[in-house]
A protein has these predicted regions:
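Helix-to-loop junctions at the C-terminal end of transmembrane segments
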Residues: 55-66, 151, 274-288, 374
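Short amphipathic helix-loop junctions that connect adjacent transmembrane helices
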Residues: 24-38, 242-258
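Hydrophobic core of transmembrane alpha-helices in multi-pass small-molecule transporters
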Residues: 13, 81, 92-106, 231, ...
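Conserved MFS/SLC helix-loop-helix module at the cytosolic interface between two early adjacent transmembrane helices
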Residues: 52-90
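Residue-level signature of mid-helix packing/kink "hotspots" within the transmembrane helices
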Residues: 20, 48-56, 106, 140-141, ...
Length: 406
């Protein structure tokens, strides 16, 4: 493996390690500053909303200006943003920073886009992507544990210290990318465009419009039920994870250190489940349309959420996290496979794009719903919204399965 690929993998690892350090602590920090659950919900919705439009924008800029240059610039913006987040005492500024991060935090996408610039063999590229996923998964698993320990050892200044570390990590990543050798792959040159189209806000709005345009192109009469399954899984997990840390802290009085352990534990289970997806599929040799697997996913998620709801201690809670993580990991893959299976290669790219847009829209709506419930009914009631979503999925997937069998 070349030195350049090793550098790219190191950047991908350090990126998710840094994110894992701080993201689980942000909601608790905002609550400590006096922010309501609605503000906590806004944190997730603002980030997801900007991510919805920024992917095509950053990708287009990287084609125009060069992936290495754009990656360095975005990493430096993220470095400054996280550092300021740790120093500010204003919730409004934190919300603005989340929007800025949603716009510029595209490290994983850009590192994947950089791989073909330094490795031309398609077969080796697939192997590199697999290793990158495993290495990045290790980063997001270690991050919450380390961040939790630091936050617990220094409750007053721990968040500021962690934010500074995260800022340094992103700056270090920018330095690593700088040392990548110059790629021989030519940068695309676009024809000159008007001043209006050079404006970043215009390009962002164009990207958002393109996301909705993709949704408009889909024949919903043919695919609506599968996209509904996708939305139900995304909404259920989005609502649940939006107040995950606060729920553990409020219900079980866990310290940041142990919250980090629980988050890392669930991440490991999800990674292992994704790794063994081929083995899991071997039990469904006659389930050609994925309808049975889809029904089992919603059933597993519903049972898991019920188990979490009635858990009387954190050990029982951790046990029920295992089937929840498995169901979530498999569910993301099953809904995509159902879409591709029904498409018969017709508009496959459009359908994948629409699937991602549905997931992104769920990511925008879910945190706000979670924040609203937490604010007006209590944090312990948030999980009921996730349970309702998965139970609707159980009923729909059961009827879907019956129709397919007939």
């Amino acid at each position: 493996m070349s030195f350049s690929i090793c550098l790219i993998q190191a950047v991908a690892f350090l990126d998710l390690l840094a994110v894992g350090l701080i993201v689980p602590l942000v909601s608790g920090h905002v609550r400590k500053m006096g922010g309501s659950h609605l503000y906590v919900g806004l944190l997730g919705s603002i980030y997801a909303g900007f991510q919805l439009g920024s992917g095509p924008l950053i990708g287009s800029l990287s084609d125009l200006k060069g992936r290495k240059f754009i990656l360095i610039m975005t990493l430096l913006v993220c470095s400054l943003s996280y550092t300021v987040m740790g120093m500010t005492n204003s919730i409004i500024i934190i919300l603005m920073i989340r929007g800025l991060l949603g716009l510029f935090k595209q490290t994983q996408m850009l590192t994947k886009a950089l791989v073909p610039d330094y490795e031309r063999d398609p077969h080796k590229q697939g192997e590199i992507y697999g290793k990158m996923a495993a290495i990045s998964g290790a980063g997001i698993t270690l991050g919450p544990m380390i961040g939790g320990h630091i936050a617990e050892d220094d409750p007053d200044n721990g968040f500021t210290f962690i934010a500074t570390i995260v800022g340094v990590c992103f700056a270090l990543n920018a330095g690593l990318v700088y040392f990548l050798p110059k790629s021989n792959k030519p940068v695309k040159r676009k024809p000159k465009i008007s001043g209006e189209k050079r404006n970043l806000s215009y390009q962002l709005m164009t990207s958002v419009k393109q996301s909705f345009a993709v949704l408009y192109q889909v024949k919903w009469s043919k695919y609506w039920d599968i996209f509904m399954f996708k939305a139900l899984v995304g909404f259920a997990m989005g609502v649940y994870y939006s107040n995950y840390s606060l729920y553990l802290k409020t219900t079980y009085e866990l310290s940041p250190k142990y919250i980090g352990y629980v988050i890392s534990f669930q991440g490991v289970i999800g990674s292992v489940s994704s790794y063994f997806i081929g083995y899991i599929n071997s039990f469904y040799t006659h389930d050609d349309d994925y309808s049975l697997r889809n029904f089992h996913v919603f059933l597993l998620l519903s049972i898991s959420l019920l188990g979490l709801l009635f858990s009387f201690n954190v050990m029982m809670y951790a046990v029920w996290l295992i089937p929840l993580a498995i169901g979530n990991a498999i569910g993301r893959l099953v809904t995509l496979e159902m879409i591709l299976k029904r498409s018969h290669n017709d508009h496959r790219g459009t359908l994948i794009g629409a699937s991602n847009s549905v997931r992104s829209l769920s990511g925008v709506v879910a945190p706000m719903v979670s924040g609203f419930i937490g604010q007006f009914y209590g944090i312990s009631y948030v999980i009921y919204a996730s349970l309702c979503s998965t139970l609707i999925g159980v009923v729909m997937s059961y009827h879907y399965r019956k129709r397919r069998v007939k």
